[in-house]
Structures are given as C-alpha cells and as structure tokens.
Amino acid sequence: MVDKEIIKRDEIDILNDACFKSLFRSVEARGMISRFLSAVTGINKERFLNAEYIGGELIKGKLSERGKIADIIIKLDEEDETCIVEMNKYDTGDIIEKNLSYAYSVFNEKTRRGIRKWPKVILINIDNFNRFNADEPIIELEMRDKNNKYNVDLVKVYHIVLDNFDNLNYNIDKEIAKFVEFIKTSKFSELKKISRGDNDYMAGYRKVEDLSTDPEFIGYYDYEQAHQDDIEMAEYTGLKKGIEQGIEQGIEQNKKEMIINMVNEGLELDIISKITKLSIDEIKKISNN
C-alpha cells in the first residue's frame, strides 16, 4: 500500500477535470452543490438534493470516462427537466458551441422517446475565461424575439464567468459568490476558512481533502492535470494546427516524466497502469531509462 503521507499536499486545483467531476457528483457535497444550482437557476434546492446525478462518483478503474459527453448531467424530478454542468477551464475555440450541442442532444433524445410534455434543458457553463468580453459575472441566454417580448425557455444557457466575480459593480448572489470562491481556492487552509461554520461546505471541504489523500485519484489527477493542460493550452494558442507533431512529442515527453514521478513517489505499478493505460512492463522500461 502507498503511504498517504507521501502524496498529501497543501493545495489542489478544484477546476481540474477529475477533481471537479468527483466533487460535483459526490453525495457529500450535494448540499453545497444544490444551493449553488438553486441560486443560479431559481429552481427549488430540494429538487437538486433529490435529483439523479448521472455517472455518480468517479469509479475506480474507470476514471477516464471516455464515453461521457458532458461533465455532469442532472436529471430532475417528474417535471422532466435536465441540468447539464460544464467546467470550462480553457477556451479551446469551440468549447461553448460544443457544450451547447450537448444540451440540444439531450433535448432531442427526450423528444424522440415520446413525451407527455416538452422537456426543458438547462446548461450551466462555469467559464475560467471571458469569451464574451462581458462585465457581468453571470450571463443568462435564452431564445427570444428581436423585440425582447417573447421567449421560449425549453433550452436555457448560463455562463458563470469566474474572472468577473471580483467586479464590485454587480450585486452578486451570496450563494453563488461563495461557491465560486470555494472552487477558485486551491489552498486547503483557505478552503477550510471559507467552509467553517457551514455544514454543507464543511462536507464539501472534507470530500476534497479525502480526494487529495486517495492514491489512485491523486495519481490520475496529476496525470490529467499535465496532460490536459498541454492539450488544451495548445488548442487555445492555436499551436495545434501548425505543429501537431511537435505537440504530440511534447505531450509524450510530459507523460514519461509524469510516470517517472509517480514511480518515485511510490505509487503502485498497477495503479499507474490503470491511469496511463500502459502495461507494467512499459512503465518499468520508462522508469528505468
């Protein structure tokens, strides 16, 4: 077994894809998540507390989730509403359009199955960038006529622009502001201060703390952090189109370095194999070079 003290750390990036999904889908953090979603959408918090969060927590051995089309899909009660939540760490050029296609895919799937009433789909984008060059911390989009008199609310889209929550010109809902502060904070000492005195947030804090000492999760977290940053930043800067081969070589080198670091930190070879999809023999070969 791997000694938890070996991998214990003082901070963690909650915006990391693996961490965000695990936190958002967890039963432990359901209270703080429901309060946030309710404040954004105006939907009663109890409905989010009792909703079905498709995919559940990340399953050991199946962490890559290659078949998933969205970060979190929440099936609300008999009202036949679905809420999709997407963490967008980088603007890769088409990320917003791609997420919108997810929302319409869910809508189309529901209409094909035969319906008693038209379904509603809510898409919440948590953006770590400002695609619209907006000042507002929260942007709400829906289908309206050009005179802004009539609207169709079957598909509604929200953008939570993280960078704009420091803008004091807007009266930001306290529940949304607190959640944004939490997910933007990486140091455990600060996360604990934010959560202190709030049972829902303390439960969320403890979940993140538990994740940070899970050997398999943290190995995947580190690998995903390095791998995704390389890929997404390459797309973001436009390098991918011009020098794909060089990027692939860089990612491959980064992958090798991550494997060597995992071995040096004492992570078990079978766990590294699950994370990287490489055989134990391949891992040994890389770590011995």
PLM region spans:
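Short helix-to-loop capping/linker segments positioned immediately adjacent to catalytic or ligand/cofactor-binding
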Residues: K110-G114, D166-L168, E190-S195, Q249
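Short, charged alpha-helical interaction segments and adjacent helix-coil junctions
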Residues: V2-E11, D77, T82-N88, A177-N289
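Generic structural signal for hydrophobic core residues of well-folded globular domains
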Residues: L23, V27, V40, D127, ...
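Accessory alpha/beta interaction modules
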Residues: M1-K156, D166, T237, K241
